Amino acid sequence: MVFNVNILTIFPEMFPGTLGYSVIGKALNKGIWNLNVIDIRSFATDKHKTVDDKPYGGGPGMIMKADVIGSAIDNVLSTNKETKLIYMSPSGVKLNQDISGQLAHFSNITILCGRFEGIDRRVLDFYDFYEISIGDYILSGGEVASMVLIETCVRLIPGVVSNVDSIRDESFTASYGLEYSQYTRPANWRGLEVPSVLVSGNHKKINLWKTQQSYRITKQRRPELTNTADGDIYE
């Protein structure tokens, strides 16, 4: 099954951007996933291709128009009725690995990228958009956020990352949330040694060390991700 992604944006030239590089770009070139970028401005009917207007009730900035965006969405739905509609929004559900895993199982998703002060709320309500945030901060638009979402989904698709253990052992996928510390050659760098257990050849001890590291790092930096009832054995 090919993972199809539709992007609704007023800046189509921003894509594929970072999605054209590394394993995500290779997967795109191989046809493992497909990117369809749609210019919202092409659905504006006036000669100036206007996509925004002043907000009712006053306030700063401009709001993206429901009629223009609605036409763009209708165009997508005319050929993809089952597509999952997503809006990148700071007020949405915070993105995590579980959400990415769920979305990666869809055959078709459509991501709406807002600009200015946002989208006319009627659009989101009428089409029942799923709103997603990538963090507690503000960007100038949804394009960069959409790239983050797409990458987190695509790399979970079989065949994208060649080593499945890489995904299994990653932060938020491993048992205790955050990934253990990683090291490579040289064994001694500026007087700092690689932990001796990692060069011991004892795989049982190595696996235990990784689990302990994962738990301790998670407990220190993201304690809400740890299961305190089971944690004592990893102290």
Swiss-Prot record:
GO cellular-component term (any): cytosol
Gene3D superfamilies per UniProt: 3.40.1280.10, tRNA(m1g37)methyltransferase, domain 2
Keyword Cytoplasm found: yes
Pfam families from the UniProt entry: tRNA_m1G_MT
GO terms for MF: tRNA (guanine(37)-N1)-methyltransferase activity
Family named by the database record: Belongs to the RNA methyltransferase TrmD family.
Identification of the protein by name: tRNA (guanine-N(1)-)-methyltransferase
Species this protein is from: Ehrlichia ruminantium (strain Welgevonden)
Gene giving rise to this polypeptide: trmD
